[in-house]
C-alpha cells in the first residue's frame, strides 16, 4: 500500500453558514500527481488552501507525512504553492527570484547556486539566470514561479490553476512539461483546475468535486469511462443521456428507454434493481453513425435518428442527431480522410455502440433539458 503524504479527515470549512468544504476525507499518496477538479464554487481551491494552511478548517484534521498540521501556519508546513498570478519580484532577475527563499533560510551560497541551477534546468530555463521577469513571456514567467517553488524541495507542491493565464497552445505544452517535471523530482503535486482535459492529461488520480464534496475519485480513465453520477458524466467530457427503466438483470442489465427501444449495459454490477428508473449514457466518440439502409450490427446497441447538424472540426466530424423521444444526441467521428462517406443534414441514420460502452447512473431528479442548461 503506497505511503500517504496528505490526509484530510472529515474536513469542513464554513464561511458563515455556507460549507465551502463539507465533511471531506481524502488520502493522497507520496509522489502522486493528484488533481482537484470541478466547476467554480465547488470547494477545490478552499480544499487546497486548507492543505497549505492559508485557511483553517472549521472542523476536521489535516495531516502531512503522518503529522497533524491542522493548527500550523503555512511557513511551518513542508509545502510550497504556485498560484495563477506568478508573484515574481520585478526588480530581481531570474536567479535571484528563484534563490529568494533559500537566502531567507540562510542556506550556504554554494548550495544555493547548486539548487538554483538544478531548478532552472528542470524547467528548461538554463541561460536565463540574469533576465528580468518583465523581459519574459507568460510561459517563461510561469516556469520561474515553478522553479522558485521546487528549489525549496517541499514534501508537497500545491498548484492553484497555474496555467489559467496562458494561451491554449502554451497551456497544453506546459501540461506535459509539468507532468515530466513531477516524475523527475518525485514530489507530490496537488493541482487545482476546472479544465477537464488538463486534469486527465497530468493526473495519476483526480477527484471531481461538487458542493464541497467529492462526487467521484479515481484514475482519469476509470472516472471517464465509468462515471458514478450524472454530474460526473456531464462535467468530465461530453455524454449522451437517455431516460429508461431496468427491465432485466440477467448477466447484463437491459434497459428499456422511455421511447421504447431496449439497450444493454455491459456492467453487470449496476446499483439498480429491475423496475428502477435510470439514465443510460454513452460518450459521443463511442458511437458509430451509419445509414438506416445498412443492416443493424449484431451485439450492439442501436437507435434511429435524423442528422440535424454536421460540423467539420478538423480532427473529427461532430454531429447532432435527433434521437429517441426527440432527444438530441452528439456523435464524434474521427476524420480518416474518406471523402463523401459522411452523413448529411436531414439524413436518417442509425447510431450504434457496444454494450460495454454504456454506463448507467441514477437520475438527478431534474429533467435532462434542465441538466444540459446547468452544464
Model regions and ranges:
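Conserved coupling/switch loops of ABC nucleotide-binding domains, chiefly the family-specific signature
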Residues: 58-61, 111, 211, 243
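ABC ATPase nucleotide-binding domains
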Residues: 33, 72-234
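Non-catalytic connector elements of ABC transporters
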Residues: 239, 248-375
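Helix-to-loop junction immediately C-terminal to a conserved catalytic motif
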Residues: 52
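Conserved ABC transporter NBD signature motif
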Residues: 60-68
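Pre-Walker A (P-loop) beta-loop-beta motif of ABC nucleotide-binding domains
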Residues: 24-35, 89
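The feature captures the beta-strand-to-loop junction immediately N-terminal to the Walker
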Residues: 37-39
